[in-house]
Swiss-Prot record:
It holds the Pfam family 60KD_IMP. Belongs to the OXA1/ALB3/YidC family. Type 2 subfamily. Keywords: Cell membrane, Chaperone, Lipoprotein, Membrane, Palmitate, Protein transport, Signal, Transmembrane, Transmembrane helix, Transport. It comes from Streptococcus pneumoniae (strain ATCC BAA-255 / R6). The chain crosses the membrane at residues 58-78, 130-150, 169-189, 207-227. PROSITE patterns: PROKAR_LIPOPROTEIN. This is Membrane protein insertase YidC 2.
Amino acid sequence: MGVKKKLKLTSLLGLSLLIMTACATNGVTSDITAESADFWSKLVYFFAEIIRFLSFDISIGVGIILFTVLIRTVLLPVFQVQMVASRKMQEAQPRIKALREQYPGRDMESRTKLEQEMRKVFKEMGVRQSDSLWPILIQMPVILALFQALSRVDFLKTGHFLWINLGSVDTTLVLPILAAVFTFLSTWLSNKALSERNGATTAMMYGIPVLIFIFAVYAPGGVALYWTVSNAYQVLQTYFLNNPFKIIAEREAVVQAQKDLENRKRKAKKKAQKTK
């Protein structure tokens, strides 16, 4: 997926999160209980019960933290697919850049040819643009269900964790700031191994945390806690499973090996010329 498309997706995600916030705070406010009949209410209450079970009678906040870790661990294969897709996309960028230089025209024929050649590159390198969307799409109903659980299930909306009323916004802004910081670290680590960067990439790196901060400011404290833990988990996942520093070192090793091979060939050629 190109950077411009990612920016559009990020904007759409931010708008969706704000809409979800409005739905949770200004939408249906009737309580959800074990007797609620519709499917969505049953799903919301099921999530609430999982959180209560994981709280171990210590704190609902502990339950949300463990619930987040559980969700992220279950979704780990999906997120790993996203990370692999992102890495393949990074590796494809030099070839994509060359194609854009080869077909710079804005006419329909040039654009069609460019898209055809780009599809060939993506297919050859095993890049599927949809792989980047799955983690976002899967997490959306989870976050929305958590919104609803914190505003409509009694034992969650009255829960506390440290100084936070989990059913209300965090007026101290500590959690929104932490959510933004961990989002930035996650994005920064993901972009660290990029062989090429541009203004759009930088805009994403700073823009996504801003969107998350705004979202977390107006969200219930429990949702801000979920987002903070989720992105902290993402930082650890990226570092241990897709370490950008290791990727950079491997890339530099390949470049150095190529230089060494060229130097040996050059020396061998000079030596052969001297013996003639």
